[in-house]
Amino acid sequence: MATDDGSFPWTQESILSRDLLSALSPQLCYENLNRSCVRSPYSPGSRLILYAVFGFGAVLAVCGNLLVMTSILHFRQLHSPANFLVASLACADLLVGLTVMPFSMVRSVEGCWYFGDSYCKLHSCFDISFCSSSLLHLCFISVDRHIAVSDPLIYPTRFTASVSGKYITFSWLLSIIYGFSLIYTGASEAGLEDLVSALTCVGGCQVAVNQSWVFINFLLFLVPALVMMTVYSKIFLIAKQQAQNMEKMSKQTARASDSYKDRVAKRERKAAKTLGIAVAAFLLSWLPYFVDSIIDAFLGFITPTYVYEILAWIAYYNSAMNPLIYAFFYPWFRKAIKLIVTGKILKENSSTINLFPE
């Protein structure tokens, strides 16, 4: 439509200028709201790739750990105190994949939180609680493996279902109490009120943690990590000594087959090796994140956002690693997966199927 002087209000140059300004101006999480957070400046192609990578991790964490839990709980051969501890660990990792990773995925890719302030706090509680629970489970599993390898014949009387239940209960209760109290009491933000106020925007969900609690978090990671490394160092020394003793005995006596004690010791060493790899994967996944948290807290939050997101997702991906480790090292787990996927566990008496090679 022409103006009074016969000219058009929108020329080609003005349209191009408007489009250029629109392209250069930052996109907001909520365009029509004041103090809206700014969206991440990723291209559509980059967003698609990130969603695929992060989404794959979440699906793998849920499906893989669900297979671990189903295998252990369904097949009677796997009903042991140690395996119940492993199933509980899988439950913690499953919950990370179910309640934490999908929402963190959207926040990481979009730079926005679309799930409300209430779930923002709850999401942070789930994040801290379930990841802490994984750490404590792995710590107790290392203690279990040490007992099993050091004295495999007495082990069944020392690590009973009651002991396993106490370990599981402690791991869950302590983690949940710690995670929820840290977030809902506001203890983590004490002394950071001005910073929190300055950074608060609509569509954001970042929990501020002061130096004291960052240091406490690091210690809560470091102490169990040192315990696990110490215990597994002892385990491998014992395993090496046992292997040397068995080799000497095999040279001295022409045995047609291994003794029962040797077979048990061999099986426990293999289990310790597999779970030791799971522990190493956990430590390697989470150590960079905790080190960065310490650096950030004491040097003024200098870590670029994309670096923080990379470290966080390396840590999250650990929740998907354990099922892959079990599938690689445990033939019984591969057989259990096949039975579950093909639906054979729905048949009568499927729980009594022999999963171990003769």
From Swiss-Prot:
TM regions (residue ranges): 48-68, 84-104, 124-143, 167-187, 213-233, 275-295, 310-333
Signal peptide: none
Listed name of the protein: Trace amine-associated receptor 7g
Glycosylation site residues: 34, 210
Gene3D superfamilies: Rhodopsin 7-helix transmembrane proteins
Stretches assigned to coiled coil: none
Positions in the Cytoplasmic compartment: 69-83, 144-166, 234-274, 334-358
Location in the cell: Cell membrane
Molecular function, one GO term: trace-amine receptor activity
Protein's job: Olfactory receptor specific for N,N-dimethylalkylamines trace amines. Trace amine compounds are enriched in animal body fluids and act on trace amine-associated receptors (TAARs) to elicit both intraspecific and interspecific innate behaviors. Ligand-binding causes a conformation change that triggers signaling via G(s)-class of G alpha proteins (GNAL or GNAS).
Membrane topology classification: Multi-pass membrane protein
Keyword field: Cell membrane, Disulfide bond, G-protein coupled receptor, Glycoprotein, Membrane, Receptor, Transducer, Transmembrane, Transmembrane helix
Family: Belongs to the G-protein coupled receptor 1 family.
